Each structure stands twice: as structure tokens, then as C-alpha cells.
């Protein structure tokens, strides 16, 4: 019988699960399945797991437990979320979402194949294309007034619920989450706010009027549903997203993923208001055994007076926190914000805390990025996360994020 490696679907969105099966092998055979992908800079990411075939000579990743490798146990998508960079401290992140997918090569070997120095030919291979954009989604480059970014629109006439997508100190324009959400029926503006085109090269301050201009632009678009928009935000972006929720009436639903609930590093300005950043206790910074810097404890001693005025938020706020976040004690920050809401008699906040999850909680099946190189620091920064717990958090939170936006952005009678 011919040995086969079957992966279905072989062409799908990155948040869709893939079924992987090996057939035509001898019974009780130890096999290796490897996954390999290159990013747009030719950095290689790889994972592997060792399995034992059943009496029919088959391995089904939905049923067969991995005996060893990058994970152990039954994890149908383990080869995807356990991908690791061959060169340390690289992060797998799609830049050109419209024109190409990540192409993941799956290879099957009929032995334990783990030595890089020994080349063994694979018995079967399969390619899987993982897209960040679905059929019919359109991308519009945005350069309106001061606003710089990319707007992703789902197929159809609309109007669609509108969302602004913000990332952190990575800067530039990050589009992969916006394009993926647009593939699920949301109109999403991936918004740059520094280190992009004619925007400031460095983040010297957060000018909230820039983000208000972006919110007004989005609401003025003919395909955007009224009366308000959502914000999805991560890290420094989540700090800005929370400030938008507090001060901008246009924002009615905000998702803050592992962000500070204070102003950090640089001041925040809005009209006549200036919010100075809290001081970080840099002497509490720790260095991980890998050499990556952990900032988790540098903002632990924040005072309640430093918390952004969440009670002023006119919309709903969803805090998503990883309890193993090594960049920020994000659970403490979110708890302080929730406490402030309660003291003001507000029930507009909700917190989802994930034990074992790290800082970079991304769409399902994204590889855990425990640490990555930060040019600004000249060394790697630690994000934390336990592989299995982090993967579970990404799956669950992605569903909850979409449910949250559907509930609070859609008018009664609308369908999505």
C-alpha cells in the first residue's frame, strides 16, 4: 500500500483547523511528522512530533497522541501552534496578507527523525496554504488627513460593523488580524501610529486626537454601520485602545489584549488634557535564562490614581489577559480597572484571564512567540507563555472577541 500524508483543507484561513492523517504504514510503526514554513524574510520555522501507527498502519492527529517532539498528547493543530524559529528570537508574522499565504510543508518520516545533521528522505509530503484573508475581502490603502493605515472590507454591500485594529511598540502597519476579522464580516481599519510613511519615526507621545480622527474617518465611510465603532488592541495599542474607550464617544466596544490600564512610557494628550506616564521600576526588570528581558514586575506598584478613567467609557470593554505575560502584569492592570469600574457602579467591563498564556495572544493556531528581538532595546524581549495553555487561550479568546463585537456593534435585526 502506498504511504500517504493527507491534510484537509489544504487551502484555508489561518484560524481554520486542518485534519492531518498518515496512511499506508506498517502497524505499530514509529513515525515523525514535521512542519516547516518560511516567513517573507526567509526565516525558517519548524515543528515535529513523533507518533505510533495503529493496527491499520495509520496516524490521525485528531485521535493519535504524540509520544514526543514539540508536544505530547492529542493536539490536532499542534504542528502549527508549536512552530519555532530555527534562529532564536524571530516572530512569525505575515506582512503581505493579500497576495500570498504562509505555505506550510508537512513531511512524514518512518522513524524518529530529529537530528539536523542526518538527512533522511521523507516518505510522503503535503503542502498546506494558510491565508490571512478570505475570498472577496478588499483592501483600501488609507491616507486621509493625518490617518494612515489599511481598511479591509468584507464582500457585499454592507453596512458592516467597523473596528480599528491597534498593535504595540512594533510600530509600522500590522494587517494580519484586520484582514482575518474582515474575512469574518467586520470592516477593519488596521491603523498605524508611528514608524510608517510620514508618521513620526518614534513614539514621543500618544496624540488621542489622531485616533479620534481615525474613528471619525471610519464612521464616515459609507460601508460602516452606525452609530459607533469597536477597537481591538494589543500591548501598547491596548493602552491606547482603553484611552479611546474612556475619552472618545465614537468607541462603543473595546477589546484590550494584555495592555496597561495606565499611561506608560510616553504622555497621552487629548485637547487640553495631558496624562503623564507612570514611572517604571526598571530595577525590577529580570533577565530570562534565554537572555530575553522580562518587564513584568516593573509596573506592579501602580497606584489606583494612575488608572485611566474607565468609568467614563460609554461603551463596553473586554480585557483579555495572559497570566504568564512576562512583559506586563496585565492581569493586575485589568483587575485595577475592573475595581475602578465597580467603585463607580459601572458594569461595562469584563475580564477573561488565561492561566499560562503569555503576552502575544493572537488568532488560533498562531505559534507561541515566547520572546523576540527588539531593535530599540538591542536585545530580545520576553513575552512569556506556556505552549499548550497559550494555544488554548488563543482559540477561546478569538471566539469570544467575535461574539463580543457582534453583540455590541450590531444593531438589532442585523445579521452577521
Swiss-Prot record:
Annotated motif Microbody targeting signal, positions: 414-416
UniProt entry tagged with the keyword Phosphoprotein: yes
GO molecular function, one term: N-acyltransferase activity
Enzyme Commission numbers on file: 2.3.1.-
Pfam families: BAAT_C, Bile_Hydr_Trans
SUPFAM superfamilies reported for this sequence: alpha/beta-Hydrolases
Expression sites by tissue: Expressed mainly in liver and kidney with low levels in adrenal and little or no expression in other tissues.
Main location: other
Gene Ontology cellular component annotations, sorted alphabetically: peroxisome
Domain of life the protein comes from: Eukaryota
Record keywords: Acyltransferase, Fatty acid metabolism, Lipid metabolism, Peroxisome, Phosphoprotein, Transferase
Keyword Ion transport: no
Protein's cellular compartments: Peroxisome
Active site: residue positions: 235, 325, 359
Annotated catalysed reactions: tetracosanoyl-CoA + taurine = N-tetracosanoyl-taurine + CoA + H(+); eicosanoyl-CoA + taurine = N-eicosanoyl-taurine + CoA + H(+); taurine + octadecanoyl-CoA = N-octadecanoyl-taurine + CoA + H(+); taurine + hexadecanoyl-CoA = N-hexadecanoyl-taurine + CoA + H(+)
Disulfide pairings: none
Cross-referenced Gene3D superfamilies: Acyl-CoA thioester hydrolase/BAAT N-terminal domain, alpha/beta hydrolase
Residue list for modification Phosphoserine: 125, 414
Signal peptide start-end: none
Described function: Acyltransferase which efficiently conjugates very long-chain and long-chain fatty acids to taurine. Shows no conjugation activity in the presence of glycine.
PANTHER family per record: ACYL-COENZYME A AMINO ACID N-ACYLTRANSFERASE 1-RELATED, ACYL-COENZYME A THIOESTERASE-RELATED
Sequence similarity: Belongs to the C/M/P thioester hydrolase family.
Protein name according to UniProt: Acyl-coenzyme A amino acid N-acyltransferase 1
Biological source species: Mus musculus (Mouse)
Amino acid at each position: 500500500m502506498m504511504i500517504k500524508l493527507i491534510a484537509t483543507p489544504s487551502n484555508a484561513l489561518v484560524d481554520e483547523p486542518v485534519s492531518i492523517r498518515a496512511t499506508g504504514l506498517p502497524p505499530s510503526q514509529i513515525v515523525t511528522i514535521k512542519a516547516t514554513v518560511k516567513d517573507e524574510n526567509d526565516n525558517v520555522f519548524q515543528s515535529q512530533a513523533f507518533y505510533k501507527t495503529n493496527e491499520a498502519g495509520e496516524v490521525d492527529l485528531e485521535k493519535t497522541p504524540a509520544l514526543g517532539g514539540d508536544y505530547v498528547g492529542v493536539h490536532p493543530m499542534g504542528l502549527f501552534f508549536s512552530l519555532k524559529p530555527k534562529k532564536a528570537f524571530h516572530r512569525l508574522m505575515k506582512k503581505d496578507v493579500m497576495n500570498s499565504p504562509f505555505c506550510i510543508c508537512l513531511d512524514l518520516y518512518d522513524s524518529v527523525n530529529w537530528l539536523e545533521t542526518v538527512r533522511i528522505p521523507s516518505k510522503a509530503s503535503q503542502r498546506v496554504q494558510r491565508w490571512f484573508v478570505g475570498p472577496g475581502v478588499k483592501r483600501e490603502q488609507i491616507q486621509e488627513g493625518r490617518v494612515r493605515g489599511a481598511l479591509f472590507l468584507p464582500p457585499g454591500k454592507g453596512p458592516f460593523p467597523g473596528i480599528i485594529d491597534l498593535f504595540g511598540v512594533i510600530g509600522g502597519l500590522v494587517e494580519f488580524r484586520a484582514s482575518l476579522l474582515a474575512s469574518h464580516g467586520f470592516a477593519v481599519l488596521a491603523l498605524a501610529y508611528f514608524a510608517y510613511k510620514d508618521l513620526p519615526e518614534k513614539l514621543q507621545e500618544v496624540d488621542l486626537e489622531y485616533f479620534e480622527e481615525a474613528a471619525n474617518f471610519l464612521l464616515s465611510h459609507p460601508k460602516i454601520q452606525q452609530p459607533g465603532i469597536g477597537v481591538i488592541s494589543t500591548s501598547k495599542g491596548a493602552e491606547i485602545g482603553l484611552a479611546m474607550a474612556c475619552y472618545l464617544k465614537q468607541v462603543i466596544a473595546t477589546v484590550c489584549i494584555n495592555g496597561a490600564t495606565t499611561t506608560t512610557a510616553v504622555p497621552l494628550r487629548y485637547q487640553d488634557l495631558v496624562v503623564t506616564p507612570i514611572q517604571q521600576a526598571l530595577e525590577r526588570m529580570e533577565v530570562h535564562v534565554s537572555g530575553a528581558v522580562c518587564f513584568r514586575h516593573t509596573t506592579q506598584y501602580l497606584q489606583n490614581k494612575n488608572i485611566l478613567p474607565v468609568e467614563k467609557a460609554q461603551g463596553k470593554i473586554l480585557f483579555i489577559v495572559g497570566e504568564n505575560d512576562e512583559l506586563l502584569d496585565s492581569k493586575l492592570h485589568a483587575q485595577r480597572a475592573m475595581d475602578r469600574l465597580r467603585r463607580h457602579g459601572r458594569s461595562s467591563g469584563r475580564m477573561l484571564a488565561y492561566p499560562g498564556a503569555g503576552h502575544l495572544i493572537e488568532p488560533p493556531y498562531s505559534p507561541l512567540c515566547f520572546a523576540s528581538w527588539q531593535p530599540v532595546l538591542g536585545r530580545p524581549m520576553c513575552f512569556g507563555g506556556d505552549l499548550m495553555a497559550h494555544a488554548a487561550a488563543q482559540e477561546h479568546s478569538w471566539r469570544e472577541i467575535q461574539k463580543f463585537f457582534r453583540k455590541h456593534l450590531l444593531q438589532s435585526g442585523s445579521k452577521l
